[in-house]
């Protein structure tokens, strides 16, 4: 548990020990707060000589106090990383209500919308996010962010900006996309070039914060328009996102995506994120933080135009599923997997399925001790001539069906550390390999097992160290 700093202790005292504040100290505090907030104080004295604020100034004072409490609460959140040490928003608001700093209605408004307006000033406690769209109909004919007036396939341009530019949710062709329905984030659409396809703007006062679920967010855009232009993607705040599955899926019109501004530190699933992006030739994932990601299945499946994928920044120590990760990347020539930690991966099925242009894959750092499924892993990898799987330890392996089917140029497979004791499904594992292939195995036991399943390959199977 992190140690509390002196600043943290001061904040706690400020937040929790207010009963001892004297009237004089309170007045001084209020005046200081008002000076800091740029509020001019107008006062009158009654017959008892007690200083009284005008009603307007009282409200301004109250707004300043609430704003100060908000700032202290946020600062405390930055100092203490542990939730158990932070004062929850509910407790802060209960205390402020008890002290008559806010009303019951204002407390409820903050809990529901994340903000409150006092003396004409909006005080934001929680920015909120845009709506989640994973439950929408996300085909090309589906709505976009809840708007049923436009189809995803008819959108030709997305512009993400950091100002509302005077737009209101009640404006024609404008709608509120904030999860709290407080107008924090808006979207509007127009047809500037009169071609019956839409330019959509997503806006907020500041960066647009995505929902925890960004699932299917940009799916199937531009399908009918025949193009999709994405501007201002760096204005998306992805810091709270946990689910990016199928975020750009079926984006057949995407050609270049620079996602280097994405904060992915909380993301747990990226399954199918670029699934079916058949025209994508370049994707920049340089700053991706994948330390919490568990699922990478189908990540690039169907990205048939891409030739190079650089995953140097990927930390995969918590990933369990890599099913179809590069499946159907027919033009993929180079993929860098040197940063991969695969110690927890149980499923590598179809990982390189139909990667017809790959001539070499470096597995030197792969740990396959947890892997159960290697089924279809290299199906139709027609340019591979050699596979060095010498560090594959497979004590938990269950399924190797059609593992090398269609690898018609493969002359050597080194599996000198693999064991097949638990394998239950092995059909067609070696069936389509060339007749002169050499398969290196660990010992006579593994040779006997493979030979018994594939007797026509008996002469091709060699024990390591033996000629």
Which residue stretches match the model-derived regions?
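Low-complexity, S/T/G/P-rich flexible repeat/linker segments used as non-globular hinges
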Residues: 124-134
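Membrane-proximal N-terminal amphipathic helix
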Residues: 49-83
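N-terminal leader/signal peptides at the extreme start of proteins
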Residues: 1-19
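N-terminal single-pass transmembrane signal-anchor helix
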Residues: 19-42
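Non-cytosolic, low-complexity segments of secreted and membrane proteins
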Residues: 53-55, 88-90, 129
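Extracellular/periplasmic head regions of type IV pilus-like filament subunits
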Residues: 74-122, 126
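Small/polar residue-rich beta-strand/coil "junction" motifs that cap repeat-based extracellular fibers
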Residues: 38-52, 403, 426-431
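Negatively charged
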Residues: 134-467
